[in-house]
Amino acid sequence: MMGQSDAGEDIYEIETSLKIETALKIETELEIETAPSASDVEFLYARITESNLAATGLPAAERISAWVRNDSGEIEAGIYGWSWGGTAEVDLLWVSESRRSAGIGSALLTAFESEAIARRCSQIVLSTFDFQAPEFYERRGYTSLGRVDDYPAGGWHTTMRKLI
């Protein structure tokens, strides 16, 4: 719903479904989705990649992943991320409970780091929560760049970096 402030400025109220009226009085529908389609997400990635290329001249990010599978082909551990512009980013690192403390997480991270070096990256960044063993990354040379407290409630989140 739109209104005006005492100064005559447009004010917008955010709802899960709303209409946005611009200064040109063009009406646009906006809906919050909790399960967007893969094609919609890929559309956004393609548009941001185009924008990034136009702004930086750098090609699209290249994905990096490694997996540990059991004899049945089920994933028991994996790492996923990408490299772009001389930096690699770990998006996901997970090891099943039954395979933890066996060095698999370290092996996956080392493989990711080696691939980042091969791609001539100078640093690796990642984000983690207090309950996701940030000390695991600290032991491997990652340092915190900053912390967001109470995310999630009662916990904290940090972004970490390692120069390679």
Regions found by a protein language model. Name each.
Residues G3, G8, Y12, T16, ...:
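Acetyl-CoA-dependent GNAT
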Residues L44, Y137, Y142:
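Conserved active-site tyrosine of GNAT-family acetyltransferases
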Residues D91, R99-R100, Q123, F136:
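Acidic/histidine-enriched, beta-strand-rich ligand/metal-binding domains
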Residues S101-S114, R139:
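Conserved acetyl-CoA-binding loop-helix of GNAT-fold acetyltransferases
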Residues L108, Q132-A133:
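Conserved short alpha-helix immediately C-terminal to the canonical SAM/SAH-binding motif I
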Residues A116-D130:
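Conserved GNAT acetyl-CoA-binding A-motif
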Residues V125-S127, T143-T159:
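Conserved catalytic-core motifs of GNAT/GCN5-like acyltransferases
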